[in-house]
Each structure stands twice: as C-alpha cells, then as structure tokens.
Design a protein with these regions (language model features):
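Short catalytic-loop micro-motif centered on adjacent basic/acidic residues
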Residues: 44-49, 70-72, 121
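Short glycine-rich anion-binding loops that position phosphate/pyrophosphate groups of nucleotides
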Residues: 10-12, 74-77, 100-102
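N-terminal small/polar loop signature for handling phosphorylated ligands or for N-terminal nucleophile
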Residues: 51-90
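Short beta-strand elements in bilobed, periplasmic/extracellular small-molecule ligand-binding domains
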Residues: 31, 37-48
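Short, glycine-/small-residue-rich phosphate/pyrophosphate-handling segment
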Residues: 47, 95, 104-139
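Extreme N-terminal starter segment of soluble prokaryotic enzymes
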Residues: 1-5
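Glycine- and acidic-residue-enriched helix-capping/strand-helix junction motifs
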Residues: 14-29
Length: 139
C-alpha cells in the first residue's frame, strides 16, 4: 500500500474565512474528504498543516517513509526558496495542489517556486485537486 504525505500551508486551517475564490468548507471537512477519498483508492494518507515555514521544511525532511508528497504550500508557493530546497532533497514524486487557479489570481500569486520541482501541478480544481493528485499515485 502506498503512503502519501499531504502538506497544507498557511491559512488553509481557516479555509472557510478565506476570499471568495476558495471553497467555503471547514479545514477539518477538507481533510476528512481527502482521507475518505484516499481510502477508496487503497492509498494511505497522512495530512499535516502548518502556518510556519520551518515546520513545513521539517515535515519534508522527515518524509522519507512516504512514497510521495502532495503539497499545497499556499502563499509559501510564491515566496519560499527554502521549501523548494527541501523538496529538492525528496527523490520521489511531488504533486503541487492549489485550490484556486493561481494563474487567475493576483500577479504576485501566478508564480510558484514549487512548480519547479513538482512532478505535476493541479490548480483551480478545489477539493477535487487533491483527489486528482491522489489518483496520480494510483498509476
């Protein structure tokens, strides 16, 4: 059975309070849906969230027991070379997910450092983006 680590970045824990582009769902419901979907695929999922860059880096550095990472680094996608550097040390598939379409957001959100290393980027599909990422690991 494949084991995948899902890492969610800053402010996703208050998803229901975010801008109108975001799904109006509580974070705990997002996590429940991700886990429920993964269970139907036979993939074991561990979901973590942090508002702190260093904690996200430590999660990546300790991820060797996983077969892949699904990461929504949120605003850190556009700013964190440190997270990019940590991801470069993970030699297994990495799928970047964004709930909103970052290409249709503010100009400063249209670039993602994570995309440089990601096996695939899924953007603008809402919660279904996580399901699509899980499906990539079934292949």
């Amino acid at each position: 059975m494949k084991k995948i680590l899902v890492i969610n970045g800053p402010n996703l824990n208050i998803l229901e309070k975010r801008e109108s582009e975001y799904p109006k769902v509580r974070y705990k419901d997002l996590v429940a849906e991700i886990k429920s979907y993964a269970k139907t695929t036979g993939i074991k999922i561990s979901v973590k969230q942090s508002n702190h860059e260093g904690e996200i880096i430590e999660l990546i550095q300790k991820a060797n027991k996983y077969d892949g990472i699904i990461i929504n680094a949120a605003a850190y996608s556009h700013t964190s070379i440190a997270i990019l550097d940590a991801l470069k040390t993970f030699k297994k598939p990495i799928i970047e997910v964004h709930l909103t379409d970052i290409q249709k957001r503010e100009e400063y959100r249209r670039f993602s450092y994570i995309s440089e290393i990601a096996t695939k980027t899924i953007s603008g599909k809402g919660i279904d983006g996580y399901k699509g990422a899980i499906d990539e690991f079934k292949k």
